[in-house]
């Protein structure tokens, strides 16, 4: 009976089986998500005559939360040109809670069933970056995450991510017809951030620990030279938030068939109810309805109400993030508007009837 139960998404209980069944209908369960904070800082390079300053990928800051200190990183480098005063300003830099790691694979086309599986769990798949270095020419090509079939041809440098056993992730590439196939002997470099999920939420005090560099001429070559001084204190316009754990099995079983029914197109209100939780993790419940249901009707609009897991109302930043995530699914002519929740608090008085023969002291009622 158990074997039969595990063959259907409604009755399966083992995560690997549920994920595999969801994959058959095109649903990729959400990975663990890193808490994201925004920081500002400046670097004075007036004495270095630097044309630009680069904040390299990897650790950027250490954030303090009540339950300890956490590492915050960025998945790719950020380059800023200094102003006329020689000061480079890094503003609203998004930093992700977690450790930045890399893994390399050598392509061997003679191996029929080659698999590129990342060895770590707790990866935030949105931070995965992939590049391929040609073994003959040394040319480096950046591969981007697959979004939809319309962008794919034989030269499309794209990769797919799918969850495999033990909550690890496999990187998939094209076959030379649908997506470019990495050439034999090339080196695949995958970088990603391993995160603590919800534990990283709430950091608002950061100490800089990043790696800054600027280009300096040395003979006939340009070398990256570290910048170790004149870095300002960090300011934090947004504390870390929206960290979440991997999508639970029950959620996968609920959302997978509904997202499949929407065909990844946000057209009806039910489509939005299914797609919003898949693009934004910090959601307890969501309701959507079309403007045609209002009096007077507001055609061409869909209204979305979200109850977040933390707090009572969505922030403007969260609303913008959801809209950005939905953009790839929406159709032209439909506007999304968020409606804040209204809470109804009820206070009540009660009258209790009891038999004095069983309870001699009415004060004892409070323990019954």
Regions found by a protein language model. Name each.
Residues 63-73, 136-142, 274-294:
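Short, well-structured beta-strand/strand-turn elements
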Residues 80-138, 170, 180-266, 331-368:
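Acidic, glycine-rich low-complexity/disordered segments
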Residues 1-124:
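Extended assembly-interface regions of large multimeric machines
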Residues 44, 77, 193, 307-309, ...:
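Solvent-exposed coil/turn segments that connect beta secondary-structure elements
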Residues 263-368:
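Carbohydrate-recognition loop of C-type lectin domains
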Residues 68, 76, 87, 169-173, ...:
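A generic structural motif
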Residues 127-174, 178-181:
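Extracellular/luminal ectodomains and secreted, surface-exposed scaffolds of diverse proteins
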